[in-house]
Amino acid sequence: VAPFPHGKLVTYKYIADVKAGVDPSLV
């Protein structure tokens, strides 16, 4: 589970960013 409380839409974006090779800490 992603460690932030922004909800499922952001969680899916987080997963997509990780798959794209984007560091989620920069998003």
Curated annotation (Swiss-Prot):
Protein keywords: Lipoprotein, Secreted
Domain of life from the UniProt record: Eukaryota
Presence of keyword Protein transport: no
UniProt key word Lipoprotein: yes
Major localization class: secreted
GO CC terms, sorted: extracellular region
Reported tissue expression: Hemolymph.
Subcellular location(s) of the protein: Secreted, Extracellular space
Subunit (UniProt): Homodimer.
Protein task: Unknown (it might play a role in lipid transport and/or storage protein metabolism during metamorphosis).
Protein's name in the database: Larval-specific very high density lipoprotein
Source organism of this protein record: Apis mellifera
